[in-house]
């Protein structure tokens, strides 16, 4: 890469970095705006956490991601409940956009999996029950868990380590 290419790459990094700083500043501003509107720093909300107490019990990173996505879904329910409040609409939209990007990789299909597909599963429907029982062993089996892939990877690596090339 020549000098001009390095200069253009550097400028691109500066532009991208400054735009993300601007977005973070805007996000903090909207959070504090909501905090002030709801008087969320008052002593009546200081009697214990709502979600943080739950989150403290989850230690593993993958477990935390699961519970955080559940908590984010609750925030979205709260935002939907307040959607008619014009004063906080921009703040909620900004925060919701950031949450979708962070926890659902900006994927609307992932966002809708939990609240629309899982929670609203008609558990009294016989066909649903039959499908659930049919999939039960696949869900519980190591086929879908990350640990099974790790075991397979370790197993395949150990077979390669056991073989030595003869000269």
UniProtKB/Swiss-Prot annotation:
Keyword field: Antiviral defense, Cytokine, Glycoprotein, Growth regulation, Pyrrolidone carboxylic acid, Secreted, Signal
GO CC term, one of those recorded: extracellular space
Region Disordered: start-end pairs: 148-167
Tissue: Released primarily from activated T lymphocytes.
Record bears the keyword Transport: no
Modification sites for Pyrrolidone carboxylic acid: 24
UniProt-listed InterPro entries: 4_helix_cytokine-like_core, Interferon_gamma
Subcellular locations according to the entry: Secreted
Family matches, as SUPFAM superfamilies: 4-helical cytokines (SSF47266)
GO BP term, pick one: defense response to virus
Glycosylation sites noted in the Swiss-Prot or TrEMBL record: 39, 105
GO molecular function terms noted in the UniProt entry: cytokine activity; type II interferon receptor binding
Assembly notes: Homodimer. Interacts with IFNGR1 (via extracellular domain); this interaction promotes IFNGR1 dimerization.
Function: Type II interferon produced by immune cells such as T-cells and NK cells that plays crucial roles in antimicrobial, antiviral, and antitumor responses by activating effector immune cells and enhancing antigen presentation. Primarily signals through the JAK-STAT pathway after interaction with its receptor IFNGR1 to affect gene regulation. Upon IFNG binding, IFNGR1 intracellular domain opens out to allow association of downstream signaling components JAK2, JAK1 and STAT1, leading to STAT1 activation, nuclear translocation and transcription of IFNG-regulated genes.
PANTHER family with a match to the protein in the record: INTERFERON GAMMA
Family listed: Belongs to the type II (or gamma) interferon family.
The protein's name: Interferon gamma
Species this protein is from: Dasypus novemcinctus
């Amino acid at each position: 890469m020549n000098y001009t290419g390095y200069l253009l790459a550097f400028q691109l990094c500066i532009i991208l970095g400054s735009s993300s700083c601007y977005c973070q500043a805007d996000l903090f501003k909207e959070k504090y705006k909501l905090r002030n509107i709801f008087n969320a720093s008052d002593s009546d909300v200081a009697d214990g956490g709502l979600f943080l107490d739950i989150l403290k019990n989850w230690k593993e990173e993958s477990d935390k991601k699961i519970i955080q996505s559940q908590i984010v879904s609750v925030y979205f329910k709260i935002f939907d409940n307040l959607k008619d409040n014009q004063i906080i609409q921009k703040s909620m939209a900004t925060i919701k956009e950031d949450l979708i990007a962070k926890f659902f990789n900006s994927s609307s299909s992932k966002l809708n999996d939990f609240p629309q597909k899982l929670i609203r599963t008609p558990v009294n429907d016989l066909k649903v029950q039959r499908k659930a029982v049919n999939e039960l062993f696949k869900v519980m089996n190591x086929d879908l868990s990350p640990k099974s892939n790790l075991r397979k990877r370790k197993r395949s690596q150990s077979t390669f380590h056991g073989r030595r090339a003869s000269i």
